[in-house]
Amino acid sequence: MLRTFTTHSRLINELFANYLNTFFAFCELINNSLQANAKNIWIDIDYTSNDEALQPLVIKKMVIRDDGDGVYVDDINEKLLNIGTNNKEGGKGIGRFAAFQLGQTIEIETVGKSQAKNKSSKTIIPLNYKSFGKNINVSEVQVTTKEEIFDGILKTYYQVTIMDFYDDSITDSSPKKKIVDKLLKENLAAALFERYSLKIYNRDVKFYVNNHLIDPTDYIIGSPSIEDVSYIDKAGKNHVISFRYINLKHVENRKVFLTTTNAGIQTIASGFEFDAEWLSPKIGGWFIYINSDTLGSDLYRNISLDDMDENFKHYKAFLKNQSAHFFREKNKEFDNFLDKLKQDDYYPYKDKQSSSKSKIMLFDKLAFLVEDKYNLLNEKNKLREIIYPLIDRTISNRELDNVLKSVLKLNNKTLTQFNNLLNR
């Protein structure tokens, strides 16, 4: 069937490359699936293999399929071909075209249903970016669809197939179309978990990447901690801020994500890393998701200018203080150890000061890891007389690796962290 696009006075090139990078565009397609009440999302990507050395593209083909509501044939014009309209509450109505930021050729395939008619339909819509040009009147663009109608109610789905990804000749001048690291084979599952961890943990939706289920137990330690805290802004208005703390495997840093609700989906608006010298070396990696029903997303727009934006500066200080309070509670074992360590006769800095505060801090953390492994201080083991000076000398000589590997048997990531601390 021959159908025609409609739009509302927005340039096509603005609509089709409107996201910060290709991962954000990809996530917009995922958000569309979530808005359609999908419980399962399958992502199949044909990556260029190592033996295809002359292949200029990282990705040859991407298919995103969900088991959401789908679009019935009677709604195709309004819901799929009307660009820039608000088809979903709170949404821009352009998210389904985010695929054009990844590739030039798209095929939309959907099965929708009409309960009133007791019928289902299957529609296939082929699209190509070149059909739109840069300034063409969208109402002149026609597309030939394949449509079938069936009696009864079928299982609905929505599928987007993306092909003809952009090569360097295009991405050099349009960097927003370049495939970013989060979309690479080794990174995508973790990036999806970071973006949608609460939904994945709560099993609101299941993600499959090349037939592999993203399992929250592969990423999360224990259960998320949830805390609602009162915040008073610069104008004196009170807000309830929700903190969700998730302890992670295979991650060492702590990321704070500021989220907002967009079209009914909680999405990450911005973020920053949280760190403090007093943190225990066993504190591990955490994602901290922050949300408020009363704080608008406008507050997050100036995060890069937080020293100039007093409202955001005030809010960020509150977030850091609240996060610090949470980790202080987690830090008690380390704090109690330090109290004992600094009173110990074998503590090398009990009666003399080090020339470097960072050296003392590094020693304290290494001594804590030794204690955790060998229980020297708690059992008053006299090996402290040998071990503590050994740690002190290796720090002074900048030869940590041997002790860290042979005594503590730390992994390479932790070794790197301690060496970075040493080099401060």
Where would I find each of the regions flagged by the language model?
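Conserved ATP-binding N-box helix of the HATPase_c
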Residues: Y19-S49, G95-F100
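Flexible nucleotide-binding loop
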Residues: K92
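Long, K/E/R/D-enriched contiguous segments that form extended
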Residues: N420-R424
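Alpha-helical scaffold elements adjacent to nucleotide-binding pockets in ATP/GTP-utilizing enzyme cores
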Residues: L29, D75-K79, A98-L102, N187-A191, ...
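Conserved short strand/loop->alpha-helix "switch" segment adjacent to the catalytic nucleotide/phosphoryl-transfer site
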Residues: R3-E28
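GHKL/Bergerat-fold ATPase module
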Residues: R244-L408, N412-N419
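Glycine-rich ATP-binding loops of the HATPase_c
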Residues: T105-V111
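Interdomain "switch/hinge" adjacent to the Bergerat
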Residues: M1-F5, A36-E89, A116-I288, S292-I303
